[in-house]
């Protein structure tokens, strides 16, 4: 991002887009697709933290509209909704027709989990999948705002729970 702003200082017109967690079909072993594949395999635990989500068609449409607009040299946060992880996990589980993750993972439990994950990765037993940052974020409840993009373009964002139902069959 710093390089983009440097380019702006050189005279380029730039728009920075910071999306929330982007949900889209396919790619079960990458990005947000790992949420679907992990829950499908049988995730037992959930947390009560929140984060921002957006559907990939909304990202594409909004970026296209920004490129066609007169707007330049600004940064936008693209989110449709701030949702609790527990609710998202339950929605994904229901859409995949698998058991919901019913046990609450406390901050202590997620701390232990990331340390075990780090140890197993250090010993080359498995690839790193759960970091300290992920553990901390899973309990964070700081909402993100999309007011700037809403006031500029007045976009209509897809309902995330409905979109999860739509894309779940691709996993």
Language model regions located:
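Proline-centered turn/helix-capping motifs that create local helix->coil transitions or kinks
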Residues: 12, 25-29, 124
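Conserved SDR Rossmann-fold cofactor-binding beta-strand/turn motif
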Residues: 18-19, 23
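Mid/C-terminal beta-alpha module of Rossmann-like enzyme folds, strongest
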Residues: 62-129, 146, 151, 157-171
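Short aromatic/basic micro-patch
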Residues: 16, 53, 82, 143-144
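Active-site Tyr-X1-5-Lys
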Residues: 1-16
């Amino acid at each position: 991002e710093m390089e983009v702003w440097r380019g702006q200082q050189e005279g380029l017109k730039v728009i920075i887009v910071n999306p929330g967690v982007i949900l889209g079909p396919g790619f079960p072993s990458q990005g947000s697709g790992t949420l679907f594949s992990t829950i499908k395999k049988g995730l037992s635990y959930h947390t009560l933290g929140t984060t921002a989500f957006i559907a990939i068609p909304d990202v594409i449409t909004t970026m296209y509209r920004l490129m066609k607009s007169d707007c330049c040299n600004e940064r936008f946060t693209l989110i449709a909704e701030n949702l609790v992880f527990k609710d998202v996990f339950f929605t994904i589980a229901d859409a995949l027709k698998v058991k919901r993750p019913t046990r609450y993972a406390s901050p202590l439990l997620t701390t232990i989990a990331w340390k075990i994950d780090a140890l197993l990765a250090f010993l080359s037993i498995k690839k790193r999948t759960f970091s300290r940052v992920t553990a901390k974020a899973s309990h964070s409840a700081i909402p993100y705002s999309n007011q700037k993009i809403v006031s500029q373009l007045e976009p209509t964002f897809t309902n995330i729970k409905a979109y999860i139902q739509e894309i779940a069959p691709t996993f």
